[in-house]
């Protein structure tokens, strides 16, 4: 029978519930157990597809085309398991389903209420994940914080769930904050005590406490929380701040999280195999140019590669989370250090690409929507093309590459995307035919996994080493085939198309060290242990460029309008 783990959060939001869920999934999988992870989000949106990246961060797309919370990306990367639309549930989708049932008469005239109709629908969604994949364990993360009004139906549903499946088949983990108060010179457990008290007031007694803190908990503090929160001391787990999220599974393994979970669920204790994950973390942390011994021999870290991501949502780095993680995976595999620069596309418009990109070894233009910053992205493509800097365009990044070529090489007057200029005389990017009559924005794009046929003897084919690939998409606009012959005549290579040849999926330039752009999102399929080949080869090309000093930034102050943020791996 499938076992169920529920992860709640207290004290503050963004405390790391998703990483705890993903880490526990990795620890269980390392013991040979199959795992599926579900996210319950309390917002009323049906899905995050129409939400602003500034508020919500990245929209992660599953193979079956669901637009989901970015935590599903963590789940997939940590467990190396593909999730589906069943693994992402919002309160909006729950209410939508219940209201649709009421309109059909499914409730036979009964009064529809939060209890039992909403809570029953929530429980059914959890059971649906178990029935679909039949995993050994379903881990469910409840979004938000205990005490939020929005979370109450979810908390009531999981309270009932233990009674439904019997006690030994359900486990409650509460992730909470134990802050260090500098003025007092000590850590304070009172916020955790109050958070657990709030949870217990609605009928949920946590079995395990995962305590987020910036230093290790003393045994005395663990005993204190054990006493006040009615949790065995061995089930009080330290989750200390880490340089990289990929270290967290190893930290939680040392603290005994998986052992406690298996014991409480009455499951067999098995020896974990985390050797590959430990090797990955070792590669990540050895930044002192020393040799690392691996199963393949000796790996030397000898360089730092400067990568610039030119985007329009850089104020919130989570807006490009999967792109950043894919770059980290590539850096680990190539064996070099990554220095990452997030550049505001609007700044490129006003100050020029050279100001921000002169010392970049590689440039990425990621996806996005809307006209804001588009000229900065197009200027970035031109700079990368002319200066022979390795370039990777993703979704909108490919469309910008097409527009740049149309204007500067094909000499098409005022060439643009129909999305940004419906009056353009040369719409080199046009609306997909099936999108012509679409009115609703949510869930109506070309979404999910689609096949792509590669042309032989191209950079794309050399990268993938296979004729047909499958990649995840999220777009409404596409290359306009009316211009396909002109682009080929002027030197463009269309190296990937849909199997019927109708849709352009990959473009590249031959006389360039590495210039390739895709209509799809390869970042969604990159894994720590198996980096995506496009990111891997892009990073190798960037590594082969002449190494330069750190990226120059001429800004005198950091504001939301001119921000250039930097982060280095590990992060």
From Swiss-Prot:
It is an enzyme of class 6 (ligase). Pathway: Pyrimidine metabolism; CTP biosynthesis via de novo pathway; CTP from UDP: step 2/2. Its EC number is 6.3.4.2. The keyword GTP-binding does not apply. GO terms for biological process: 'de novo' CTP biosynthetic process; pyrimidine nucleobase biosynthetic process. The keyword Cell inner membrane does not apply. SUPFAM superfamilies: Class I glutamine amidotransferase-like, P-loop containing nucleoside triphosphate hydrolases. L-glutamine binds at residues 368, 396-399, 419, 476. Mg(2+) binds at residues 71, 141. CTP binds at residues 13, 148-150, 188-193, 224. Allosterically activated by GTP, when glutamine is the substrate; GTP has no effect on the reaction when ammonia is the substrate. The allosteric effector GTP functions by stabilizing the protein conformation that binds the tetrahedral intermediate(s) formed during glutamine hydrolysis. Inhibited by the product CTP, via allosteric rather than competitive inhibition. Belongs to the CTP synthase family. ATP binds at residues 14-19, 71. Residues 306-548 form the Glutamine amidotransferase type-1 domain. InterPro entries: Class_I_gatase-like, CTP_synthase, CTP_synthase_N, GATASE, GATase1_CTP_Synthase, P-loop_NTPase. PROSITE patterns: GATASE_TYPE_1. PANTHER family: CTP SYNTHASE, CTP SYNTHASE-RELATED. This is CTP synthase. Pfam families: CTP_synth_N (PF06418), GATase (PF00117).
């Amino acid at each position: 029978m499938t076992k169920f783990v529920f992860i709640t959060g207290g004290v503050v939001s963004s405390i790391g519930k998703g990483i705890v869920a993903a880490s526990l999934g990795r620890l269980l999988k390392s013991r040979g157990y199959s795992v599926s992870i579900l996210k319950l989000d309390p917002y009323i949106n049906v899905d995050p597809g129409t939400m602003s990246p500034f508020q919500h961060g990245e929209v992660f797309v599953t193979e079956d085309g669901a637009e989901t919370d970015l935590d599903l990306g963590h789940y997939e990367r940590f467990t190396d398991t593909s999730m589906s639309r069943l693994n992402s549930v919002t309160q909006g989708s729950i209410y939508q389903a219940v209201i649709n049932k009421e309109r059909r008469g499914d409730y036979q005239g009964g009064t529809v209420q939060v209890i039992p109709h909403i809570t029953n629908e929530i429980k059914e969604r959890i059971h649906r994940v178990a029935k679909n994949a039949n995993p050994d364990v379903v881990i469910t993360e409840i979004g938000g914080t205990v005490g939020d009004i929005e979370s109450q139906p979810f908390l009531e549903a999981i309270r009932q769930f233990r009674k439904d499946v019997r006690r030994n088949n359900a486990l409650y983990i509460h992730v909470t904050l134990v802050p260090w108060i500098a003025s007092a010179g000590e850590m304070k457990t009172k916020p955790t005590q109050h958070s657990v008290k709030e949870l217990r007031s609605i009928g949920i007694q946590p079995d395990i406490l995962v305590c987020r803190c910036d230093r290790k908990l003393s045994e005395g503090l663990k005993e204190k929380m054990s006493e006040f929160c009615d949790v065995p001391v061995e089930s009080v787990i330290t989750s200390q701040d880490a340089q990289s999220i990929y270290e967290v599974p190893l930290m939680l393994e040392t603290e005994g999280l998986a052992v406690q979970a298996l014991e409480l669920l009455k499951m067999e204790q098995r020896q974990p195999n985390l050797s590959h994950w430990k090797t990955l973390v070792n590669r990540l942390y050895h930044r002192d140019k020393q040799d690392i011994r691996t199963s393949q021999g000796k790996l030397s870290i000898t360089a730092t590669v400067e990568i610039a991501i030119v985007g329009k949502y850089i104020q919130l780095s989570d807006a490009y989370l999967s792109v950043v993680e894919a770059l980290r995976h590539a850096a680990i595999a190539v064996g070099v250090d990554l220095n990452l620069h997030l550049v505001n596309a609007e700044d490129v418009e006003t100050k020029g690409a050279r100001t921000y990109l002169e010392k970049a070894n590689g440039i990425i233009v990621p996806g996005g929507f809307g006209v804001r910053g588009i000229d900065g992205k197009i200027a970035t493509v031109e700079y990368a093309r002319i200066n022979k800097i390795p370039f990777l365009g993703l979704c909108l990044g490919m469309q910008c590459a097409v527009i740049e070529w149309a204007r500067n090489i094909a000499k098409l007057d005022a060439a643009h995307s129909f999305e940004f200029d419906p009056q353009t005389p040369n719409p080199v990017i046009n609306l997909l035919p099936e999108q012509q009559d679409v009115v609703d924005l949510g869930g109506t794009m070309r979404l999910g996994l689609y096949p792509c046929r590669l042309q032989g003897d191209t950079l794309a084919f050399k990268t993938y080493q296979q004729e047909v690939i499958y990649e995840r998409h999220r777009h409404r606009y596409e290359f306009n085939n009316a211009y396909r012959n002109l682009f080929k005549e002027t030197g463009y290579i269309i190296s990937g198309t849909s199997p019927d040849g109708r849709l352009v999926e990959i473009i590249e330039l031959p006389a360039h060290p590495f210039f390739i752009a895709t209509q799809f999102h390869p970042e969604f399929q990159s894994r720590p242990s198996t980096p995506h080949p496009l990111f891997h080869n892009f990073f190798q090309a960037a590594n082969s460029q002449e190494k330069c000093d750190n990226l120059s930034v001429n800004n005198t102050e950091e504001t939301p309008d001119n921000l250039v943020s930097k982060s280095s791996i590990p992060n």
